[in-house]
Amino acid sequence: MQAAWLLGALVVPQLLSFGHGARGPGREWEGGWGGALEEERERESQMLKNLQEALGLPTGVGNEDNLAENPEDKEVWETTETQGEEEEEEITTAPSSSPNPFPSPSPTPEDTVTYILGRLASLDAGLHQLHVRLHVLDTRVVELTQGLRQLRDAASDTRDSVQALKEVQDRAEQEHGRLEGCLKGLRLGHKCFLLSRDFETQAAAQARCKARGGSLAQPADRQQMDALSRYLRAALAPYNWPVWLGVHDRRSEGLYLFENGQRVSFFAWHRAFSLESGAQPSAATHPLSPDQPNGGVLENCVAQASDDGSWWDHDCERRLYFVCEFPF
């Protein structure tokens, strides 16, 4: 069937071209219409033979004279031609087997411009809304900043007020401690001594005395030392307790200072009993008690014995009773 198709496609154009050449003005006047037609048929027959040989078809297929003489070949030719026409119709109608009943119109330049302008208008409206929201946010930020500044000012005022109240409270506590020390303790000249029965390290005891408006006891002379010894003996009898004084050599070993930085001018160190001299010890809980101070760099703070008023050096981190001194 494909061979017959190819044969028809090749023969028809050639026939048309040969027919046109045969009917040219020169040929018509040279031999007349009869000779031209006969010559044309011979050429067509020769061409068909060449095509049949080239395609491997039996001789006589596609020849009208042979078709008239052989009915079977004519029927085959018609069947082949009919099938070829049907295939051509199928091929022609295949691309348009499902046509779109509502084809979409192609956009025009005016439509494109209108669309772009619409989008620009939408963007401009959105940008305007953003500007409005930004303005609202800026206003809110300004309000919050002002509120925060007011809160900071109020907090600063409150902090100043609290600081002032704390200072007043500290002064009140110091005045209360001073009055309590002079009312409950020992008043001696322009000083008052008050014993505390709480166990504290030397530094903590100094801090507590300072918070109440005083400091650890700093006996300035022998008279104050003897008066303080009698006060402690009466308060803690019949026991012997070491009591922190405001004396230390933390700055330099052997250089004893009061808490106010003044250098100590006299000492009342404990001395052991001497059998050779027959002297009595200053504080004799045991005849073999060592002379003080004997702690070196390990014992830099001074405590007073409550029974005889002698001084002993101790580790500053020991927790002992302490006696405070207040100005009067």
Curated annotation (Swiss-Prot):
SMART domains, sorted: CLECT
PTM: O-glycosylated. Probably sulfated on the O-glycans.
Pfam (any one): Lectin_C
GO annotation (BP), single: ossification
Effect of a null allele: Viable with no gross defects. Trabecular bone volume and bone mineral density is significantly reduced at two months of age, and progressively worsens with age. Bone strength is reduced and fracture healing is impaired. Hematopoiesis appears to be normal.
Signal sequence extent: 1-21
Intracellular or extracellular location(s): Cytoplasm; Secreted
Residues in C-type lectin domain copies: 188-325
Residue numbers spanned by region Disordered: 22-111
Pro residues composition bias: residue spans: 98-108
Disulfide cysteine pairs (residue numbers): 209-324, 301-316
Organ and tissue specificity: Detected in femur where it localizes to trabecular bone of the femur metaphysis, and cortical bone of the proximal femur. Also expressed in trabecular and cortical bone of vertebrae (at protein level). Strongly expressed in osteoblasts and bone marrow stromal cells. Also has very weak expression in B cell progenitors in the bone marrow and T cells in the spleen.
InterPro entries assigned: C-type_lectin-like, C-type_lectin-like/link_sf, C-type_lectin_CS, CLec_Tetranectin-domain, CTDL_fold
Molecular function, one GO term: carbohydrate binding
Major localization listed first in the record, in broad terms: cytoplasm
Entry GO CC: cytoplasm; extracellular region
Keyword Disulfide bond belongs to the record: yes
PANTHER family referenced in this protein's UniProt entry, alphabetically: C-TYPE LECTIN DOMAIN FAMILY 11 MEMBER A, TETRANECTIN-RELATED
Function: Promotes osteogenesis by stimulating the differentiation of mesenchymal progenitors into mature osteoblasts. Important for repair and maintenance of adult bone.
Protein name: C-type lectin domain family 11 member A
Organism taxonomic ancestry: Eukaryota, Metazoa, Chordata, Craniata, Vertebrata
